[in-house]
Amino acid sequence: MKGGELIAQFLVQENIPYVFGICGHGNVGLLDELYHVRDEVKLISPRHEQTAAHMADAYFRVKHQPVATLTSCGPGSANIVMGIATALADSSAVLALTANVPTQQFNRGPFQEINRHFTADFPSVLKPVVKRSFQPTRVDMLPLTLRQAIDLTVSGRPGPVQVDIPFNVFQEEADVQLEPSLGLRSSKRSGADPIDIDKA
């Protein structure tokens, strides 16, 4: 199974109804697969990536259900930082899928790679504003990574989690299957203290 197909099937399995994001050269390997599952997962493309992150944050606030964002390499992913920071501050579960350069081109500067301190280092940009950042570099790493990422978004205090996926991981194939869903979902958030509400 291709990495992109695995991710699309994962979104279906986890009942992720929307992916908010913008198509780009870095994430093209996931776009066809999202088209194949379009009846279960809708890709909505706003005009700017920051808007995508705010849409995902707002969706969780209203529905208490995590959704995903999808961005391409370099500036495309950099544009989601403020929206993801807002989601972290306000405890909104968001699965931030960011694309990165192909692993075989790490540290060569393609596709606007961020590599001044570490190879393919976009995860360091989001680390201060996510609960955790993952970067699977092979398709066989995706099942565990995706399972841990979605569970972490909703466990404990909800918040955004990043999965940074190199370009070739969307395209390459491996003999892997999805891990079963744990169904860690909450349909409501804790209510405020009634006494504090009366005071307000």
Predicted regions and their residues:
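N-terminal alpha/beta PP-like core and its mobile active-site loop of ThDP/TPP-dependent enzymes
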Residues: 1-200
